[in-house]
Amino acid sequence: MKHLHDLPAWSKLWNHFDDSKTLHMREMFEQDPQRAERYWLQVGGLTLDYSKNRINDETMSLLFELAREAGVPERMRQMFHGEKINTTENRAVLHVALRNRTNSPIVVDGEDVMPKVNRVLQRMGEFAHEVRSGSWLGYTNQVITDVVNIGIGGSDLGPLMMCTALKPFGHPRLNMHFVSNVDGSQLRDVLSKVHPETTLFIIASKTFTTQETLTNALTAREWFLNHAGDEEAVAKHFAAVSTNQKAVAEFGIDTANMFEFWDWVGGRYSLWSAIGLPIMLYLGEENFIEMLNGAHLMDQHFINTPLERNLPVILALIGIWYINYYGGGSHVIAPYDQHLHRLPKFIQQLDMESNGKQVTLDGKAVGHETSPIIWGETGINGQHAFFQLLHQGTHITPIDLIASLEKRSNLPGHHEILLANVFAQAEAFMRGKTPDEVRAELKAQGMDEVRIEELVPHKTFSGNRPTNLILMDKVNPRNMGSLIAMYEHKTFVQGIIWGINSFDQWGVELGKQLAKTILGELTGETGPQKHDSSTERLINLYLQTNRK
């Protein structure tokens, strides 16, 4: 395979970095009136302004060269054609098939997967219609008012993020709840708000053996039966998203209410599949299909557009520029919309679980940085929390500022204030404030020269801080589908360039294996096992505390 450090463009970019690292965006804008127009893209309802980055035409040309040398176009083709690019698990990677609205065949192991995809989608729609219309009744013949999704990781973060983001499109009768943490308090809090007669539980676990999910599911089942008293009532209040029909049936769920997905759907890419059942229940089939349409639009742009005008590719390459050349170890997601407050955590899992890898596809140490730490918060809150570090800290931290052009509320003046802050932050990160500008400002306030010189270093902003401004014309299912697909493809492209597998997650396994051993010790089912002295001390502390 091709190793990044052996690619000619990798070395060319280092030479270019040495020549260009002192360039300031402020001067680049002053010298180039067409800069914003040139570094500007629109795809469907999304607009990307990437002009406020430490790039010029040579930077982008070399990055596109790097992408081609790394085999990005070929790898993209392989994914869309169902080839098994997840090599460590010998699986295809076909979340794009879940939103393939053309229904053109996508073949895996000689079988077109589209009939299966459409069959499950149709069953989801029928089920959602019954619940939303009120024809699905609980064991006391009451309509469903609350839906509790029990899952973890991709079975939780995607549906939770999308239901929260699109709350204005949700069914007014349905209250959505999500349980992922096995600590007990999250489930207890949810159960205290719902009534067994009107609650539908969705258990989302591919194998139906995930410890955290099954623990919560069994507790919810026990709570339900304590009220209902009849095991046959379980079938009216529990549905499953799984492939383990036997375990689902043993739980008491009618397998007619089990919705399957496939091993070529990774958890963090699964909200488009049956894992998205809570989304369809809340938003309805039509809006769910619109979400798929938006994702498909981005898929078609991604696979059919030259790299030079390809939105996910450009975002990926700019990220490579900062991570691997500037040493930018983190990336901020800052949505300026309260309903998008779950988006940073979703992107965090998507990016860090996909690309937090230390070896290449052929098992060699990568020898360079891979996934940055992804973090963030709604933009306005971030301005009064961590933006200080972004403006005047010592880190190079690229920021995605995400906003909607259309108002989401009828409250006068709010949206204009919001967008003024978005645009102002992007300009401030780019321009900064020079010492002379600070002096002039303080002098105009009547401050004496000595005090001015004391304050100048503190009030100076270096600027040259990179941002991507991502605007939706409105927050709706279609644009949210496009936005998430954009980030999926960005993540994929970066993984290709780094030479890693973006679709496995072996890093989650070791802790789970060790937890099984320790659990036996904590419950008394096994005697003491061999651990390091710290772990043994922690186990003993727990046992001593709970003997009291």
UniProtKB/Swiss-Prot annotation:
Functional description taken from the UniProt entry: Catalyzes the reversible isomerization of glucose-6-phosphate to fructose-6-phosphate.
Catalysed reaction, written as an equation: alpha-D-glucose 6-phosphate = beta-D-fructose 6-phosphate
Protein name: Glucose-6-phosphate isomerase 1
Active-site residues annotated for this sequence: E353, H384, K512
PROSITE patterns in UniProt: P_GLUCOSE_ISOMERASE_1 (PS00765), P_GLUCOSE_ISOMERASE_2 (PS00174), P_GLUCOSE_ISOMERASE_3 (PS51463)
Keywords, alphabetical: Cytoplasm, Gluconeogenesis, Glycolysis, Isomerase
Record CDD domains: SIS_PGI_1, SIS_PGI_2
GO biological process: gluconeogenesis; glucose 6-phosphate metabolic process; glycolytic process
GO molecular function: carbohydrate derivative binding; glucose-6-phosphate isomerase activity; monosaccharide binding
Cell compartment(s), UniProt: Cytoplasm
